[in-house]
């Protein structure tokens, strides 16, 4: 082979190599398996930077695996703060980009929220996960076609917007819709009406469309995410009692504790004086936190028939979070007792419960 031919072949391989790699057949993975293999948590957004481990938050495995179930068209997650619900969304986005590309419409409550999430969460994920960095060009690259609110990749485009942006919601075809903090969305996208209905209309031409709706709960009677949960399988994260072997949800009403308080500069300061325990709803046995954290747990559906409609819904509070000791939850509750607005925040973000105005 002539030298010029060798050079030409080398240049051709260099030019088409990246494109060929991008069109490799997808791996046979669920979202959880993909995240365990490819996702890295970024140091500026995680206290546990490094490889993602689904075993750290086992309650996220089932919602992630539901995304690759062909019978599931929509996933609803109602969750307290700091349990990893944003990581659920990010893992799904990463999986789509790498394994099952298509147009994604990712919606935050406002455009400001969208820009912030893109800079602080999506950009670091792409930067630190090699398979994503290889497919999504840096916005600083000339002619990359990418901005803070739009990320192109082979086979698709990620559009990041706010529920108050009628133009994006009404004009962007999307196979995938992911809606974050649904209960904080605008009532109407400008004059166009319900933002979720506008977003869903963008999926009309996709036979394989999927939607993910995520939020902390807010006010009883006006919570969009609670309404969506009711239409799904209504699954609760339940732990096995070490005494009777039955499964039960760890909720605040079944948490037992003793405490004292004293006033310092006119303010009540609380102290937990003994172990915090959980009462099994089946046998009544009192089990300490350290034992319950080691017990097997699983999702149990209250409305399993909804699976036939393609909607799986999950509800999770902070008692199962590996980052939130029960004592912290109890103290936050006690400290908020004299302030209804603070108590409302505790109900929504820690207890994972709807607040009922009295």
Describe the residue ranges of each PLM region:
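Phosphate/NTP-binding elements of NTP-utilizing enzymes
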Residues: 2-358
């Amino acid at each position: 082979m002539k030298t010029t031919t060798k050079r030409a072949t080398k240049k051709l391989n260099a030019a088409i190599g990246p494109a060929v790699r991008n069109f490799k057949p997808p791996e046979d993975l669920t979202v959880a398996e993909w995240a365990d293999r490819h996702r890295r948590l970024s140091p500026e957004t995680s206290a546990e930077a490094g490889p993602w481990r689904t075993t750290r938050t086992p309650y996220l495995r089932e919602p992630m695996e539901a995304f690759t179930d062909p019978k599931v068209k929509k996933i609803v997650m109602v969750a307290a703060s700091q349990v990893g619900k944003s990581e659920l969304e990010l893992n799904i986005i990463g999986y789509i980009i790498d394994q099952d590309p298509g147009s994604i419409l990712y919606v935050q409550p406002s455009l400001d929220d969208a820009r912030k999430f893109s800079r602080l969460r999506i950009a670091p994920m792409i930067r630190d996960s090699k398979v994503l960095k290889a497919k999504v060009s840096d916005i600083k690259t000339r002619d990359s076609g990418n901005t803070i609110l739009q990320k192109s990749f082979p086979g698709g485009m990620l559009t990041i917007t706010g529920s108050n942006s009628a133009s994006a919601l009404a004009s962007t075809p999307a196979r995938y819709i992911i809606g974050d903090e649904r209960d904080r969305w605008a009532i109407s996208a400008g004059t166009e009406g319900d933002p979720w209905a506008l977003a869903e209309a963008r999926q009309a031409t996709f036979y394989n469309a999927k939607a993910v709706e995520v939020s902390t709960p807010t006010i009883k009677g006006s919570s969009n995410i609670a309404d969506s949960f009711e239409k799904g399988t209504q699954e609760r994260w339940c732990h096995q009692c070490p005494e009777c072997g039955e499964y039960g949800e760890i909720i605040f009403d079944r948490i037992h504790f003793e405490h004292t308080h004293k006033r310092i500069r006119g303010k009540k300061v609380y102290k937990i004086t003994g172990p915090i325990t959980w009462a099994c709803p089946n046998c009544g046995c009192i089990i300490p936190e350290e034992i319950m954290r080691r017990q097997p747990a699983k999702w149990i559906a209250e409305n399993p028939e909804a699976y036939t409609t393609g909607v799986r819904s999950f509800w999770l509070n902070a008692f199962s979070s590996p980052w939130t000791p029960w004592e912290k939850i109890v103290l936050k509750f006690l400290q908020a007792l004299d302030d209804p607005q603070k108590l409302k925040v505790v109900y929504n973000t820690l207890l994972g419960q709807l607040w009922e105005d009295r």
